[in-house]
């Protein structure tokens, strides 16, 4: 029987429920338990696929093609699981399912209400996502007290009652601020947050108290007294300089022991040697490189969360400290490429819309002409093709039909037909809805032997995740390859170009897929490791010249 750990948050948002949940799951996995994680989002959008990155941050794409919350990226990086559409659902999805059932007549003419129909659908979705796990950690998005979260909180309250204390446990993450002017830690916000939670019928079993320093014993006792939580279950969740230290910290606070004792589970001791190795590799690098990330969402780096982490993972696996310099592609359009001069490598990530595209193309040109290692992902591959078409193949005005529908040379165009994971034909047009209509999820790509991509992966076939509507236009295949563009990866049926390279360049690669979604701190990713090794070689070459 699956046991459940429900994680809620209080006082303020962005306290790190996702990382806390993933870290606890990592410890439980290290104790030999089969775990899974779910994220419940209170917003009415069906999924975050059409939400602005400035509002929501990154959209994480799962293997089965779901567009989900970025916390699922944390789950996959901390725990050796592949999440899917059952691991993340929203208020919009829940209401959509209930309304669909009502239209079918499933409720036999009854009045459809939040309780029991919405809460029952939430409980059904939680149980479906948790199926087969020893322990399911269920994170409730938002903050206790938000009106949007109430149906979710009511649903997990009911589950706690239905399953009993030995099968369900509640963890509440809260803020314990330090007031510098008074020189004191304040526990009142935590007390009020727990009071709010208890007012809707949930008594937390464990408190994770987010603070910039460990809780003094006096404050711990005070919190325990006023929240009705046993003192040893009031855990200090201190700020750390490296999120991959958090499993080690929470284990040192005996969080996993408290959880397993309350759930009546016997498990072997945790083997956290992998996490110790990760932390050690980050703290003692052999070299340092600077990678310029040229994008349009650089004011909110959470927009590139998986990409940031993938570069860190590559640093772990190559003994390199990777410093990311975020560069606004719009500024490159007006200020020129001077800001690129002292970089060891350039990366152009994915994105949508015309804003900043010419700046990205300028960054590609600089990398190509100056022999700087370049990695282009999704749109980053497309702008590499556009730049090559314009300045090497001589196709003046070459562009993507996403930005210039009437371009004389549409080297990038809308995909109108492709095969999905099950081999079914998917068709789209320019008039299709924006939500959920892209080429999404894991797709098999065949690599050409003797190419850089094949060298990095060491395999003829790979599976990577996609999220795009536009693709390389095969009508320009002969022209561009004749000019020197290398096509090193194609879709399984050979119809779509997935990877491009330049043969007379130290390291230049563009991929239509998103390799960052499958990178983890313990395993890394071959493409990013190859990119960072190339950045190190570039750094050493630059240092030699300056000496």
Swiss-Prot record:
Q: What EC number(s) does its UniProt record assign?
A: 6.3.4.2
Q: Which reaction does it catalyse?
A: UTP + L-glutamine + ATP + H2O = CTP + L-glutamate + ADP + phosphate + 2 H(+); L-glutamine + H2O = L-glutamate + NH4(+); UTP + NH4(+) + ATP = CTP + ADP + phosphate + 2 H(+)
Q: What class of enzyme is it?
A: ligase
Q: What is one cellular component GO term in this UniProt entry?
A: cytosol
The residues listed in the UniProt record as binding L-glutamine, with positions renumbered to this chain, are 351, 379-382, 402, 469
Q: Which residues bind UTP?
A: 13, 186-191, 222
Q: What domain of life?
A: Bacteria
* Sequence positions that bind CTP: 13, 146-148, 186-191, 222
Q: Which InterPro entries match?
A: Class_I_gatase-like (IPR029062), CTP_synthase (IPR004468), CTP_synthase_N (IPR017456), GATASE (IPR017926), GATase1_CTP_Synthase (IPR033828), P-loop_NTPase (IPR027417)
Q: Enumerate the residues binding Mg(2+).
A: 71, 139
What residues does ATP bind to? 14-19, 71
SUPFAM superfamilies associated with the record = Class I glutamine amidotransferase-like, P-loop containing nucleoside triphosphate hydrolases
* Active site (catalytic residues): 378 (nucleophile), 514, 516
Domain (Glutamine amidotransferase type-1): residue spans on this chain: 290-541
Give me the ranges of the annotated region Amidoligase domain: 1-265
Database matches in Pfam families: CTP_synth_N, GATase
Q: In which pathway does it act?
A: Pyrimidine metabolism; CTP biosynthesis via de novo pathway; CTP from UDP: step 2/2
Among the GO molecular function terms of this UniProt record, one is: CTP synthase activity
Summary of activators and inhibitors of this protein? Allosterically activated by GTP, when glutamine is the substrate; GTP has no effect on the reaction when ammonia is the substrate. The allosteric effector GTP functions by stabilizing the protein conformation that binds the tetrahedral intermediate(s) formed during glutamine hydrolysis. Inhibited by the product CTP, via allosteric rather than competitive inhibition.
Q: Which NCBIfam families match?
A: PRK05380.1, PyrG
The record's family statement is:
Belongs to the CTP synthase family.
Q: What does this protein do?
A: Catalyzes the ATP-dependent amination of UTP to CTP with either L-glutamine or ammonia as the source of nitrogen. Regulates intracellular CTP levels through interactions with the four ribonucleotide triphosphates.
Question: Subunit structure of this entry?
Answer: Homotetramer.
Q: Give the note.
A: CTPSs have evolved a hybrid strategy for distinguishing between UTP and CTP. The overlapping regions of the product feedback inhibitory and substrate sites recognize a common feature in both compounds, the triphosphate moiety. To differentiate isosteric substrate and product pyrimidine rings, an additional pocket far from the expected kinase/ligase catalytic site, specifically recognizes the cytosine and ribose portions of the product inhibitor.
Q: What is this protein called?
A: CTP synthase
Tell me which species this is from: Thioalkalivibrio sulfidiphilus (strain HL-EbGR7)
Q: Name the gene that codes for it.
A: pyrG
